[in-house]
Design a protein with these regions (language model features):
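Short, basic/glycine-rich phosphate-binding loops at helix/coil junctions
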Residues: 3, 66-69, 136-140
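Active-site phosphate-binding/coordination module
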Residues: 19-117
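Substrate-gripping "pore-loop 1 plus following alpha2 helix"
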Residues: 15-20, 145
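Asp-based phosphoryl-transfer active-site loop
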Residues: 1-14, 87
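Short, surface-exposed acidic/glycine-rich loop or hinge patches that mediate macromolecular interfaces
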Residues: 15, 40, 150-152
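Short, contiguous strand/loop micro-motifs
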Residues: 11-12, 74-75, 144
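A short local structural element in Rossmann-fold oxidoreductases
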Residues: 10, 47, 158
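Conserved acidic, metal-coordinating active-site core of Asp-based
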Residues: 90, 97-170
Length: 170
């Protein structure tokens, strides 16, 4: 059994599972049904949400690019390095009002020094991340790149990112 997490099992962008869901997941497990929590979040953040049943369920993290169960990565779907490089360069060119994270199997890489954004990643999403000078210089498998803008990224997505990358990356 698979379920989305944010907005379904927990309020959006919070770290706590609705208490009644823990019991429901335990009931599924007792019946031999494997529960999989699916989210765009990173694995560490999802595991914190399900901390009471963390070793009993499967995780589908990073928008499906990271599947994890019982201490093992079952599937990792990496971005093509050339696409990742071009996307990062494009996001850098947008200026400091846009933040981005580069997701790896071990957490996120961030170039930003923006304290508000870093605090949101650490205390809001409870992400594991490393601040680096250049995300592209790191020897990591890139699973996902996410962009953040305090207001909205809708216009950027619709007018810039989707026309350029929509058919190439998901």
């Amino acid at each position: 059994f698979r379920s989305d997490i944010d907005g379904t099992l927990i309020p959006d962008s919070t770290p706590d599972l609705y208490p009644e869901m823990v019991e429901e997941i335990k009931k599924l497990t007792d019946r031999g049904i494997l529960f999989c929590g699916a989210s765009g979040r990173q694995l560490a953040s999802i595991r914190r949400v399900f901390r009471e049943v963390e070793d009993q369920i499967c995780y589908i993290a990073e928008n499906g690019t990271h599947v994890y169960y019982k201490g093992k990565d079952l599937a990792l779907t990496a971005m093509k390095p050339e696409y990742a490089r071009q996307i990062v360069e494009q996001l850098r060119s947008l200026g400091s009002e846009y933040e981005f994270t580069v997701s790896t199997p071990h957490g996120s890489l961030l170039e930003t020094k923006n304290r508000l954004f870093l605090d949101m990643m650490k205390y809001g999403y409870h992400n594991i991340f490393r601040q680096v000078e250049d995300v592209l210089a790191e020897e990591e498998v890139i699973l996902k790149i996410a962009v953040y803008h305090r207001g909205s990224i809708r216009q950027l997505g619709e007018e810039v990112l989707i026309p350029r990358w929509g058919g190439l990356v998901k």
